[in-house]
Design a protein with these regions (language model features):
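N-terminal/domain-start alpha-helical segments
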Residues: 1-123
Length: 124
């Protein structure tokens, strides 16, 4: 079972992501702030990370940069920030995708599945 870390401070959004992912056979962990999320991402084994940008403790851009220094797993940014500059910055720091809130939960699951399939092909 693929394991996904959700780093999201909005409990409602985190639970929505969790519910849809678990209904599709994924195992999930939730971190509600940047520092906890970064520690989990670096200290535990995950197959993919869903990462918000605006987080208490440490922002998602910093977390993305830090994860990319040591891990090669898909990172999908899920953020209310919809300006091109934010998308370009996130992708430039190593995110594999950038999804703007509000989002379709079914589209989120489809993107997660697509990124996991591509990473699996690249690493096998």
């Amino acid at each position: 079972m693929k394991r996904i870390l959700i780093i999201e401070d909005d409990q409602g959004i985190a639970e929505l992501e969790r519910d849809y992912l678990e209904a599709n056979g994924f195992s999930t962990d939730i971190a509600a702030d940047g520092k906890t999320g970064e520690a989990k991402a670096l200290g535990e084994a995950y197959d993919l990370i869903l990462l918000d940008i605006m987080l208490p403790g440490r922002d998602g851009f910093q977390i993305c940069r830090t994860i990319r220094e040591t891990k090669d797993i898909p990172i999908l940014i899920v953020s209310a920030r919809q300006e091109d500059i934010d998308k370009i910055r996130g992708l430039g720091l190593g995110a594999d995708d950038y999804i703007v809130k509000p989002f379709s939960p079914n589209e989120l699951v489809a993107r997660v599945k697509g990124h996991l399939a591509r990473y699996e092909q690249l690493t096998s």
